[in-house]
From Swiss-Prot:
Keyword Oxidoreductase applies: yes
Keyword Cell wall biogenesis/degradation: no
EC number, UniProt record: 1.8.4.8
Gene Ontology BP annotations: hydrogen sulfide biosynthetic process; sulfate assimilation, phosphoadenylyl sulfate reduction by phosphoadenylyl-sulfate reductase (thioredoxin)
Record NCBIfam families: cysH, PAPS_reductase, PRK02090.1
Matches recorded under InterPro entries: PAPS/APS_Rdtase, PAPS_reduct_dom, PAPS_reductase_CysH, Rossmann-like_a/b/a_fold
Pfam families noted in UniProt: PAPS_reduct
UniProt source species: Xanthomonas axonopodis pv. citri (strain 306)
Disulphide bond pairs: none
Protein's name in the database: Phosphoadenosine 5'-phosphosulfate reductase
Pathway: Sulfur metabolism; hydrogen sulfide biosynthesis; sulfite from sulfate: step 3/3
Amino acid sequence: MTALPAASITSSAFDDLDALNAQLEGLRADQRVAWALQHGPQNAALSSSFGAQSAVTLHLLSQQRPDIPVILIDTGYLFPETYRFADALTERLKLNLKVYRPLVSRAWMEARHGRLWEQGMVGIDQYNNLRKVEPMRRALNELDVGTWFTGLRRSQSGGRAQTPIMQKRGERYKISPIADWTDRDVWQYLQAHDLPYHPLWEQGYVSIGDFHTTRRWEPGMREEDTRFYGLKRECGIHEDI
């Protein structure tokens, strides 16, 4: 197992992301978290959708920094099971949950624009920007987040296949400590720590977002086909921020 130096890393070394990622690839997920918390910019936070396998990163981060802010974007259209799952994990793991919501209510948005998620790619993109991207950008700015942890994994979709452990977005560093994990790795971690999948997992939901644009997985489908009618996988948070 490759070990990174314990001494502080200079900003110039931090800018050499290719070399840094090569070293991070040789570490376990918990070591990546520990390293990023020690060497990354101040004000770390974790974003979570409280989706199918979210308990992994919530546990991984809260074990090392119990008070780390956990950002949940409440679009107003999450499954009831997601809200209950968030409540249960927040209580069990004693999470420092920070809930951010869109500036416009569901009713007002629909009065202005109709059901945007039914209006093709243009409508879906507008919906995602209003209800997901803007609140997340606001959360990261208000919390002055310098090190942003995510639960992105390469095996989740073709668009995420090249996800690095660390990337730079503006002045912010984005860390995906389980980027190289498979579904089996996730299952083993959940089993080892007696952590649950999202309640809808057992009903065939493998990627869980808003109730109107999430469908059960069926044989022959890719995971990304279960979101946004198969038109796209990403909501924009991990593309535009």
